[in-house]
Amino acid sequence: MAEITAALVKELRERTGEGMMDCKKALTKAGGDIEKAIDDMRASGAIKAAKKAGNVAAEGAIAIKDDGKAAVIIEVNSQTDFLALQDDFKAFVAASVEKAFADKLTDVAPLIEAQEAARLVLVGKVGENVNIRRLKRIEGDVVGTYLHGNKIGVVVTLKGGNVELAKDIAMHVAASNPEFLFPSEVSAEAIEREKNVFLQLNEDKIKGKPAEIVEKMVGGRITKFLAEASLVEQAFVKNPEVKVGDLAKKAGAEIVSFTYFKVGDGIEKPVDNFADEVAAQLAAAKQ
């Protein structure tokens, strides 16, 4: 059995983030074999992770890796925004997106599998649930990206143009979050729904007006709706006098696609009861 030195305990602590006593116990159990101790602690972390797996992870970060021709965008969730700002979480996210890009992954499942051991170590260290939620790989003639505070990520592909233009348009998408690329993509159902909403909201204004006037009013609202909902018709955030579609055309480019990720989109967050939370903390303190 190898001697359990202070240096060995320190190394294990630095590599796992566990407490000094836990590291010493793990090394003793592993006979001084640090790699076996890490494996044992991972197994212990897996138990902790299983307990945390039911906790909703709705915070986190978006990460992007690109080279101008291809990009990978991922979302990694944590339970708290505080953890999302910590170095250990950031390192896990960075390693995950690097892996996804290097392996040219197009589905999140292989990334989840590849990063599971590291995830378990992280969960065991930080004490809250962490999940790799989604991934998308995008390739194109020109690919530009924009990341806003690690909370919103956008990838834009162009035919023609250059990366800087694609990045500018990606920044616009991050700010405006369009639903569609072109007006033609807006469904007839969505237009009809918008029309009905307009008529209901303006019932008093249109009452008694000729049908042709009402039709013009509705047409104006639908035109505005299409401009607001489709990227190419939106006013460019850096120059509102120019539409995004015209900006691309002027540069000899065509917008092919955009991808928008926002942390927590579609995740139902639990509503915390502050009184219950305090009571639970007091009960735990008495144990």
Curated annotation (Swiss-Prot):
Subcellular localization, as worded in the UniProt entry: Cytoplasm
Recorded superkingdom: Bacteria
CDD domains the record matches: UBA_EF-Ts
Alphabetic keyword roster: Cytoplasm, Elongation factor, Protein biosynthesis
Gene3D superfamilies (alphabetical): 1.10.286.20, DNA helicase RuvA subunit, C-terminal domain, Elongation factor Ts, dimerisation domain
Coiled coil: none
A GO cellular component annotation in the UniProt record: cytoplasm
Region annotation (Involved in Mg(2+) ion dislocation from EF-Tu) ranges: 80-83
InterPro entries per the UniProt record, alphabetical: EF-Ts_dimer_sf (IPR036402), Transl_elong_EFTs/EF1B (IPR001816), Transl_elong_EFTs/EF1B_dimer (IPR014039), Transl_elong_Ts_CS (IPR018101), UBA-like_sf (IPR009060)
One annotated GO molecular function: translation elongation factor activity
Record flagged with keyword Cytoplasm: yes
Main localization category: cytoplasm
Pfam families xrefs: EF_TS
Record's function text: Associates with the EF-Tu.GDP complex and induces the exchange of GDP to GTP. It remains bound to the aminoacyl-tRNA.EF-Tu.GTP complex up to the GTP hydrolysis stage on the ribosome.
Family of the protein in this entry: Belongs to the EF-Ts family.
Name this protein carries in UniProt: Elongation factor Ts
Organism: Pseudomonas savastanoi pv. phaseolicola (strain 1448A / Race 6)
Gene that encodes the chain: tsf
